[in-house]
Swiss-Prot record:
This protein's pathway: Cofactor biosynthesis; ubiquinone biosynthesis
Catalytic activity annotation: a 3-demethylubiquinol + S-adenosyl-L-methionine = a ubiquinol + S-adenosyl-L-homocysteine + H(+); a 3-(all-trans-polyprenyl)benzene-1,2-diol + S-adenosyl-L-methionine = a 2-methoxy-6-(all-trans-polyprenyl)phenol + S-adenosyl-L-homocysteine + H(+)
Source species: Actinobacillus pleuropneumoniae serotype 5b (strain L20)
Name the record gives this protein: Ubiquinone biosynthesis O-methyltransferase
EC number: 2.1.1.222, 2.1.1.64
One Pfam family in the UniProt entry: Methyltransf_23
NCBIfam families (UniProt xref): UbiG
Record has S-adenosyl-L-methionine as a keyword: yes
One term of GO molecular function: polyprenyldihydroxybenzoate methyltransferase activity
Keyword Methyltransferase tagged: yes
Amino acid sequence: MNNIDQTELDKFEKMAATWWDPNGSFKPIHLLNPLRLDYIQQKANGLFGKKVLDVGCGGGILSEAMARAGATVTGIDMTTEPLEVARKHAEENGLSIDYRQTTIEDFVQNQTACHAEKFDVITCMEMLEHVPDPLSIIQSCKALLKPDGVLFFSTINRTLKAYMLVIIGAEYVLKMLPKGTHEFEKFIKPAELLNWCDMADLRCQEMKGYHFNPVTEKFWLNNDVSCNYIAMLK
């Protein structure tokens, strides 16, 4: 199935070389990663020994963090250069991560009765707002989740506040992200996400908002989901 926006892929292909530069194009993700890893570990009751799928893994920032926490990680993405960066960085750091260039829909289609991979934890971070059909991603994640597994989605709410902070603030004023990284009309309201999850027979256990202080460069979580947010589902 072709659930790909080539324009979106091209954006991330161009930024691949700076993926692991903590002061480069992905600085916000590097700053956010410890918080989201801690949240995932708490809600999943730890990652050690668990089988994890990172959907839209890009250059592997979260994949590596989860592998360091003891998980057996598979990372999938449709980009070429970011995946090469991910493989090289993992190898240089002695980490064994199974990176594959595939859509999650094709990943599901390639499952067989004799070899059906299921995962304890599935993460899909900052990806749904970059694809034509988010519901297809959500349904595919559900198909790969173990019955007692935990699924995490993070995305951006379609509000004026999010437009001002994520696009005007982060891309144009603070220049933390390249201009054009996000498109406002692709942002996803929590009610939309929850409706899609309900259609996929997933139930939201918790939803939290990400918040950022540009002075201290620190992220934190609270109940305000008017901008960036993360949802935990089963």
